[in-house]
Curated annotation (Swiss-Prot):
GO terms for biological process: dTDP biosynthetic process; dTTP biosynthetic process; dUDP biosynthetic process. Keywords: ATP-binding, Kinase, Nucleotide biosynthesis, Nucleotide-binding, Transferase. It catalyses: dTMP + ATP = dTDP + ADP. GO terms for molecular function: ATP binding; dTMP kinase activity. ATP binds at residues 11-18. The keyword Ion transport does not apply. This is Thymidylate kinase. Gene3D superfamilies: P-loop containing nucleotide triphosphate hydrolases. SUPFAM superfamilies: P-loop containing nucleoside triphosphate hydrolases (SSF52540). Disulfide bonds: none annotated. Transmembrane segments: none annotated. The keyword Cytoplasm does not apply.
């Protein structure tokens, strides 16, 4: 069986990506069913027992910026080794709620960690491995903030300022501009039916 594909969903907190991820995965599974392939749904940070333990620390405990980035990539290495790479080798498809683009956006753009440090970690942990497709849910930080305000108690990232999320969004868009072959940008201010129509077109092209 041919190697599977790796798809990531990205966007600032409040963009709505997680709302659409399960629906997208159900549609993708239906599309792949005839070929006896499975869709593995996962997330970052997380996806493994170690990754989930690190997620709890990363989202809720204050820490040094470089420590934060190192833990993100430690969780990612475990995720790649235990979940993503084995699934792709089996011919399954993997859909992840966030991946490395989020680290560049949040720790790089948002928190200001120099890009060269993140690029060095990326090379060490991933080599040349990148998603086959990244769906970026783009929304203005002010809109995302209003959405987050109606959600559950915020973690330390969700509690950040609009200025932080503006820098984070800008870095996401920079990443998308540098890799247009990999990114599909979704206008996350649209209605749910409009966004799902856009995702249907993404699915049709896979």
């Amino acid at each position: 069986m041919a190697r599977g594909k790796f798809i990531t969903f990205e966007g600032i907190d409040g963009a709505g990506k997680t709302t659409h991820l399960q629906w997208f995965c159900e549609r993708l599974q239906a599309k792949l069913a005839a070929g006896d392939r499975q869709v593995v749904v996962t997330r970052e940070p997380g996806g493994t027992p170690l990754g989930e333990a690190l997620r709890e620390m990363l989202l809720n405990q204050p820490m040094d910026l470089e420590t934060e980035a190192l833990l993100m990539f430690a969780a990612r290495r475990e995720h790649l080794a235990r979940v993503i790479e084995p699934a792709l080798a089996r011919g399954d498809w993997v859909v992840s709620d966030r991946f490395t683009d989020a680290t560049f956006a949040y720790q790089g753009g948002g928190r200001g960690l120099p890009r060269d440090k993140l690029e060095a970690l990326e090379r060490w942990v991933q080599g040349g491995f990148q998603p086959d497709l990244t769906v970026l849910f783009d929304v203005a930080p002010q809109v995302a903030s209003e959405r987050r305000g109606a959600a559950r108690a915020p973690d330390k990232f969700e509690s950040e300022t609009d200025a932080f999320f503006t820098r984070t969004r800008d870095e996401y868009l920079r990443r998308a501009q540098e890799a247009p072959h990999r990114f599909t940008i979704v206008d996350a201010t649209q209605t749910i039916p409009e966004i799902r129509g856009r995702l249907e077109r993404v699915l049709a092209a896979l």
